[in-house]
Amino acid sequence: VISRLDRGDFKIVGVAEKDDYLREHNGLRDKLDPNLFYADLGEMLDKTHPEAVIVYEPIYDHLRVVEACAPRGIHVMVEKPLAVNNEHATRMASLAREKNILLLTNYETTWYNTNHEAFRLIDSGAIGKIDRINVYDGHQGPFEINCGKEFTDWLTDPVLNGGGAVIDFGCYGANLATRLMKDEKPLSVYAVLRQNKPNLYPKVDDDATIIVEYPSATVQIMGSWCWPMGRKDMHIYGDKGYIYQDTPKEMRIYTNGKERQEIAPSLNAPYNDSFYFLKAAVRKEIDVPPTDLSSLENNLMVVRILDAAIQ
């Protein structure tokens, strides 16, 4: 948000932050009128009348924000995942549909050129019928990469975040798999949640392996705070070939007995950026189909998968 203000892509009309310290000490303070900061979300909404609200809060508080915004007809985009559990997600979806607001979920990987090129190739039949998807997401750990205390305090809390790595990084694979499997309902979800570093993360898992079974495919989601490096990549196997989504721009494709490396074509606005996408969706310049990575339908399934993994 801070980096985009100077570009004029959007106008911030208010910031609600219930934590007194964070409200007074954040990067937006140097960019915005102090009068735009509020301790109470409802007061901010009633005084500023925003078109949409972007939520950077503990996952547990996503429901609270939707409960405030939906009755006022204000669209919402939350950071991944949609909710801490299925109970919260169902309540949020009910409010959004009843009040006819958009409820979108943002993932970094939604804007990767390679993911969308993979979708296009698969939809064209390039690798045949999908039978296996392996998704790898994570990094060395929140403390290890020096995330701020204001973030790690809730990220490592089983109530506020809903879990550890299983939520933080398992959601990416569930989101992508749901899109690749065209919103098909899984047959089963099996998971192994580990604490490899209990001295650092005593309350939550730091490594999660989730196996999601579909009628014709197996998805293995590996979300971890124990990788030796940061990664967000995916391997998709079909009966005629495979696609390795290596980076946001680079991919390997195996068809007709040969592997080739490609740079995925750039995405066009507004499908290349969360803020452009939100603006276009709110102003009804684009539709958000149920199969979209940001859609409510996709992300309800994501929460169901994560809920099953934790249980």
What are the language-model segments listed below?
Residues T110-L200:
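Predominantly a Rossmann-like dinucleotide-binding segment in NAD(P)-dependent oxidoreductases
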Residues T90-T109, K129-I133:
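Rossmann-fold dehydrogenase core element
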Residues V1-L32:
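N-terminal Rossmann-like dinucleotide-binding module
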Residues L32-L95:
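Beta-loop-alpha module in the N-terminal Rossmann-like domain of NAD(P)-dependent dehydrogenases
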